[in-house]
Amino acid sequence: MENLESGAQDALQSKDFLSYSTLLDIYLNDPTKYSNEEKEQLLGHILTILSENKQLTYEIGWDLPQLLILYVDSDYEFNGPIRDSPGVYKILKIFENLAINGNHKELFLKSCELLNDLELSQDEDIELLKRENFFEIKLYCVFELIDACLKKIHTLYPSRFLAMTVSSFNNLMFKLTKQHGSLGNYHFVMKRVYSFCRNYISPPLPTNAKEMPQEELDKIVKDEEYLQRRLLTGFLTQVIYLANINGTEGYSIEHFSWLQQQSKSKIKFVFERDGAFCDRFVELASSFDIDLLKCFQGFITDSHKLLIGIDYKNKNKSEDEIIELLFERVVVDYQKNVLTSIVDSDAKAIKDSIIGELILFTHSIAGKKNFAKPTMSIHDSLVMTLRLIIPQMVNPKFINAGNHDVVVFWVWFALYQQQIINSKNLQLEISYIPKVLLTTFFQCLLFIVIKSEGKPNFKYMLLTLLTKLLTLSPDTGYEFIKDSLNNCPYESVYPSLIGVYKQLLLNEKWDVNSIELEKLNISSSSSNTPPKLPPRNGIKRKHFSLTNESLNDLVDLINNSSKNAFVEDNSKIDPSKLSTIAAYLNLLVAIKKDPVIVENKEKLTTLISSIENKIKSVKKSSQNQFELNAAGMLEITIERFNE
């Protein structure tokens, strides 16, 4: 301690501040060599030295943040206030001293570098909550120092410094998305952004600015005001986009929960968002004159334009060639126009994040439960889905769970608005959509289902939505299911698809426009017209009808599933294929009284006998309890079919 104090006096007398910075580096670069008590003493001593020597703080302060931040981590359990964490209170006071007495430009530059390098610790021996707490303390220290210094830098071109701040913070946010922090951690980070944007004040002009010609100065100030405003809106929307890469607030699942509560059907689950936090960002966007409705409508219009010019009925091109053209066009657009940086690749324009704007607008609409505006057709929701989801199907680096939630919400919104409020014939509307687009739309939704493992309620909601959409185009819907069960590379989705197919074969409908949403009790805020009653003498029909041809398809699918499930000369069962063959057999049990099944009993008897023989082979050869239990389960299902 004496060395630090005497070194400070020597530096002030000799003006050799670099040597003192080196001395501090020697003492501070390894926190592990000190006990908590020693850290407190060391940091307290440095605080005293800096508080008593403003010139020293100005000369050497720029080097301290990167050293001090190392002392935030400790064995503190966070059972009390943060200020009780070893050294943290003194670190906060040192940063406060730097913000007042340091060289603001040098501190700003060094702090931006530090912010850029800041990240959540990956030491799994430390509890995630503790790691996040220490990360938040570090972020608070560094970002508050940046903010304080930025307000005190005299410059004609403040946009340059603001751009550095924005860039460093965005890099931090991007790294955070890869580390999958908790919701609370994201909220803390977002609060820093909100506070910064809302309270931002342009730095002061240099003292010699008055010497410039007034016209020239006015032009610079006006240009800089514009650039700063564009940087702030870009920052706001980009951070919203980044914060939602791993999932949004749950707009679609909340809407589905609301639908269940309005319906006479059994409620599967209840979900309600707390939208207060994101409400602030919507208000902030409005204060920056971001017209979210205009942004949304522009995105939908551009999505339609993107698909214009593709000849979906071109007889000289195969369907695969048309799909290839569609995918190429959408992916190029996504990279060029949707997945944007604040400053574009040519450094010629500052851009807001389109995805961030879509999320903010979705948030502004989702909580209102008013489905009259904006106008949203099924075709609108389709082009939106294709534009945002196709790129994710092509390249995993584009995966964005927030986009999944947003597009699914707007599909539900369109269904409700067009059928319930506008009483549109949805099957007629969907019949005008080219088959290639409709099939790709279904594939996009199936892709979201595949990416929803570990989210049972979200997956259930998605499968319900997919089922409702498939009822609106039975022919295309059936081809989609058959093709998916034959060619989809994700085995895990097969049981769910088979379940959807079963519902479509079993569920009855009164007319082609019924997809159960008409059972809803519509509130007066949505419509004054009650839902139509089914016709008194309506003929009950299934959404999908089983035919001889579709039965042949089903038999082929079950045969293939059987071959994949029973391996090694039918002596073992592949665990990854068990759920699929079980789902197929349960489907047969459910539809066994269908006239087509009854008429083709012999064909099915041959199929079932083949599977029974494989089951017997497994029971005879295997000693594995899982396989024996699986064989027994399949055997029971077959018995139910044979009853």
From Swiss-Prot:
Disruption of the gene: reported phenotype:
Leads to decreased virulence in a Galleria mellonella model.
* InterPro entries for the chain: YAP-bd/ALF4/Glomulin, YBP1/2
Pfam families named among the record's database cross-references: Kinetochor_Ybp2 (PF08568)
| GO biological process terms on file | cellular response to oxidative stress; positive regulation of transcription by RNA polymerase II; symbiont-mediated perturbation of host defenses
Q: What is its main location?
A: cytoplasm
What keywords tag this UniProt record? Answer: Cytoplasm, Stress response, Virulence
The entry lists its GO molecular-function terms as: DNA-binding transcription factor binding
The cellular component terms of Gene Ontology attached to this UniProt record, alphabetical and capped at eight, are:
cytoplasm
- Quote the subcellular location field of this record: Cytoplasm
The record's note on quaternary structure and interaction partners says:
Interacts with CAP1.
Family of this protein = Belongs to the YBP1 family.
Annotated function: Involved in oxidative stress response and redox homeostasis. Required for hydrogen peroxide-induced oxidation and nuclear localization (activation) of CAP1. Functions probably in concert with GPX3, the actual CAP1 modifying enzyme.
- Report what the protein is called: CAP1-binding-protein
Q: Which organism is it from?
A: Candida albicans (strain SC5314 / ATCC MYA-2876) (Yeast)
Instruction: Tell me the lineage of the source organism.
Output: Eukaryota, Fungi, Dikarya, Ascomycota, Saccharomycotina
